[in-house]
Amino acid sequence: KNQISRDLNSQVKETSGGQNPYAVVLSCIDSRVPVELAFDQGIGDVFSARVAGNIVNEDVLGSIEYACGVAGSKAILVLGHTKCGAVTAACQGVELGNITALLSKVKPAIADVENMFPE
């Protein structure tokens, strides 16, 4: 197994007085896609906004605006991944509590792809 070669305690101490992330990454909540590990970044290097299916609502957009407009991040990256459970659930028409509203925001993208690639 690979091990993290960073001194996390030191990074926590170094960033305790403030942060200056150069980028904000919007990614899915999928546990297999840890942003900092995927890009070999340490604590304080990037803002990470995570939401199932990479859905942007006012709160997520406000977080991204904070990262860039207030904290000075210069880059925005949207990180997708394969076999996304939220996309699969939207394709299957899953309805369950609050996830129903979230999945409804994925459906227009699914319709666009289906129109581009009819079976």
Where are these regions (language model features)?
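Divalent-metal-activated hydrolytic enzyme cores
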Residues: 1-20, 43-44, 53-74, 85-119
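Glycine/small-residue-rich phosphate/adenosyl-binding loop
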Residues: 20-24, 28
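Divalent metal-coordination and catalytic microenvironments
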Residues: 25, 49, 78
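Short glycine-enriched loops at secondary-structure junctions
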Residues: 27-32, 52-55
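Solvent-exposed loop/turn segments at secondary-structure junctions
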Residues: 32, 84-85
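Catalytic core of membrane glycerolipid acyltransferases/transacylases, capturing the structured
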Residues: 32-49
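Ordered, amphipathic secondary-structure segments that act as subunit-interaction surfaces
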Residues: 76-82
